[in-house]
Design a protein with these regions (language model features):
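N-terminal ligand-binding/catalytic initiation module
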Residues: 20, 32-187, 409, 415
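General beta-strand structural signal in soluble alpha/beta enzymes
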Residues: 139, 165-168, 189-192, 223, ...
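Glycine-rich phosphate/diphosphate-binding loop of Rossmann-like nucleotide-binding domains
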Residues: 108, 113-130, 195, 199-292
Length: 417
């Protein structure tokens, strides 16, 4: 898969406006035209007609080419694979290809927009797999939100892929779908909204702690948002060794006495908030050292930040509007602030994780992506920022650094058993 980069530039006003050219025949010629990012994206998606295309690795220009790529020669690898299905890794694209699977039920901040509307996101994800990790990826949007049907569909599709990246499937269904597929399939199954997010958050926190001079054992951590990302972040922080993690959601602090929790939130209530505190997000943040938000815009106030411990770390990752704007958080006393956005310092973005994770898992023929691999990936990402370059505005590696995917892949491979 690659970008659909045509040599013949389409002659249409939408494309010319998006690319900065003066549209021929535009009635507004001579007038200033300023397009927003959203307008540019829409115009370019119209021009692209999809961000991917199929490209052949082998030329088919002669009769011999045809006989080798297709009949009769293609029968030979088929016969070998029929005797040993593992040979598919040698004779097909299975060894370096993943499926990006979504039901469109929880897409970005757009919610349940369905499989058709989810396709641009899945195409974009596939582009990032290829561009940043060299991994082929195929977007698959399923027209069902039934858990059993999704599990069956992915199981039936699995022979053609070396891994499954689940994407934008709503909680709590996403937890069951991933866990059951991991038990059924012998290839890696990875819900990036959960684990990719958790890995980059942990990487950022590792470096932020170095900047503020605190130890994980001494930190009170508040994770706001008890959906797929919040649950996975909390699990990985606990695995890493943070002893004091409190989850919050719309109901406030999640405790063992909180009513209306789904089954996964109930499980998390058993291993977090060991003091069984109750109250609001403001109550949880009082005396906290670290805040991780994967929730809603503008729900953290300056007063809440001021109530946190000195040199607080805030990752406000709601998109496109974070829980609190970085300048406001800094003015209220926060030391290190990260967001999910590229226009602020410390972008905490999954793109530094998932391409390398799958690259390593595929190259090492891992059957699963384990907790050890996730921790190794987080440490590898953190270590990509040199100690002498670490500061409150530089805790994450640059996504365009070509070393990122390679380093993460090696970290993953080193923990394949």
């Amino acid at each position: 898969m690659r970008h659909n980069a045509r040599a013949d530039r389409p002659n249409n006003i939408a494309w010319e406006r998006a690319s900065g050219a003066e549209p021929a025949g535009d009635p507004r010629s001579g007038m200033e035209k300023i397009m927003t990012t959203n307008e540019k994206a829409l115009a370019l998606h119209e021009q692209w007609h999809g961000k991917l295309e199929t490209v052949s690795k082998t030329p088919v220009r002669t009769r011999e080419d045809l006989s080798l790529a297709y009949t009769p020669g293609v029968a030979e690898p088929c016969k070998v694979i029929a005797q040993d299905k593992e040979a598919a890794y040698t004779y097909t694209w299975k060894s370096n290809t993943v499926a990006v699977v979504s039901d469109g039920s929880a897409v970005l901040g757009l919610g349940n927009i369905g499989p058709y509307a989810a396709m641009p996101v899945m195409e974009g994800k596939a582009v990032l797999f290829k561009e940043f990790g060299g991994v082929n990826a195929v977007p698959i949007c399923l027209d069902t939100q039934d858990t059993e049907e999704i599990i069956k569909a992915v199981t039936y599709l699995a022979p053609g892929f070396g891994g499954i990246n689940l994407e934008d499937i709503s909680a709590p269904r996403c937890f069951e779908i991933e866990e059951r597929l991991k038990k059924i399939l012998d290839i890696p199954v990875f819900h990036d909204d959960q684990h990719g997010t958790a890995i980059v958050v942990l990487a950022g926190i590792i470096n932020a702690l170095k900047v503020v001079g605190k130890k994980k054992e001494d930190c009170r951590v508040v994770v706001n948002g008890a959906g797929s990302a919040g649950v996975a972040i909390t699990k990985l922080l606990l695995t890493y060794g943070f002893p004091n993690v409190i989850m919050c959601d719309k109901v406030g602090i999640v405790s063992r006495s909180t009513e209306g929790l789904n089954w996964m939130q109930q499980k998390m209530a058993e291993v977090t908030n060991l003091g069984n505190e109750t109250g609001t997000l403001a109550d949880a943040l009082r005396g906290a050292d670290i805040f991780v938000g994967v929730s809603a815009p503008n729900i953290v106030t300056p007063e809440m930040v001021s109530s946190m411990n000195k040199d607080a770390i805030l990752f406000a990752m709601a998109n496109p509007v974070p829980e609190i704007m970085p300048d406001v958080a800094k003015a209220a006393g926060a030391k290190v602030v990260g967001t999910g956005r590229s226009d602020f310092p410390n972008q905490v973005n999954n793109v530094v994780a998932f391409p390398g994770i799958f690259k390593g898992a595929l190259e090492g023929r891992a059957a699963q992506i384990t907790e050890e691999m996730k921790l190794a990936a987080a440490n590898a990402i953190a270590n990509l920022v040199p100690e002498d370059a670490l500061n409150e505005d530089n805790i994450m590696p640059e996504a365009f650094d070509p070393k990122v995917a390679e380093v993460v892949a090696e970290a993953v491979k080193s923990h394949i058993r």
